[in-house]
Amino acid sequence: MNLDNNAHSVFLLHYHLVLVVKYRRQVFDDSISSRAKEIFEYIAPNYNITLEEWNHDKDHIHILFRAHPNTEISKFINAYKSASSRLLKKEFPQIRQKLWKEHFWSQSFCLITTGGAPIEVIKKYIESQGQRERKRK
């Protein structure tokens, strides 16, 4: 496992982000998804974010990414949604016919933290902390 680091910490923070088109309008195809991914990869380094995985369905995208602890994820998501909405509508004018009042993305999003170990393993690890120390006393 390769950990990320900065001057004072070591970390590995993965997030699963799902962004949905407003009113679930079916606008994504491979070319639009590919361009949306390019926009993500262009903006992400400004927020210390690294794309790990990308996939789409007709009305939403799934993004797996890594971030630093000081990353303001909600600011990044808003910046991405704003830029991608503007650029995708400009570069793919046919999208506008499917949208409602020029709104591309739903206001809401789903953001889930992910990790390398199942939650139960982490809970047991946390519960066991200090037990060896208590046994020594």
Q: How should each PLM-predicted stretch be described?
A:
Residues 1-137:
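Basic nucleic-acid-binding interfaces
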